[in-house]
Regions:
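Short aromatic-enriched loop/helix-cap "lid" or pocket-rim segments at secondary-structure transitions
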Residues: 8-10, 89
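Catalytic pocket-lining loop regions of alpha/beta-barrel enzymes
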Residues: 19, 34-136
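Glycine-rich phosphate-binding "P-loop"
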Residues: 13, 17-33
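A metal-dependent hydrolase metal-coordination microenvironment
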Residues: 1-8
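A generic structural motif
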Residues: 1, 25, 78-82
Length: 136
């Protein structure tokens, strides 16, 4: 969604079943949104009940923690934080994810562990440990 999308365009998207805007922030995966666009877009979609779906390298969460936390709409972070190099539950970036979840306005998908796991199936012990920590 371009930041300059009209209200009519948003209404049309909502009528078609759209309920959120995806921010794809993983390097070399398109980066079709800019971090500076997050707040203006969030202000526009919050009254519609939409959410931001955020895909980023979780190792950068601490850099964007304040920005993410202040959004007026729900923010859903993909894939157990999508730490492109798996981290431990003691990592500062994982601590940032946990603080964001504590706000009550940020959610995380416990999905697609295969995308970042280095230990692999069937247990995905590295990324699985993060998911286990989050559900405790």
């Amino acid at each position: 969604m371009p930041p300059e999308a009209t209200d009519e365009a948003l209404d049309s998207l909502g009528q078609a079943g759209v309920v959120g805007v995806r921010f794809q922030m993983v390097p070399n995966s398109g980066n079709i949104m800019a971090w500076d666009d997050m707040s203006p877009i969030a202000q526009r979609i919050a009254p519609l009940g939409w959410n931001i779906n955020l895909q980023l390298d979780g190792r950068t969460l601490a850099d964007y923690e304040a920005l993410i936390a202040r959004q007026p709409c729900r923010v859903v972070i993909d894939h157990v934080g999508k730490f492109l190099e798996p981290v431990t539950p003691l990592d500062p970036a994982f601590a940032a994810l946990r603080r964001l979840l504590d706000t009550g306005n940020v959610w995380v998908k416990l999905s697609a562990m295969y995308e970042t796991s280095r230990t692999g199936a069937p247990e995905y012990r590295d990324v699985g440990l993060l998911a286990e920590t989050l559900v405790r």
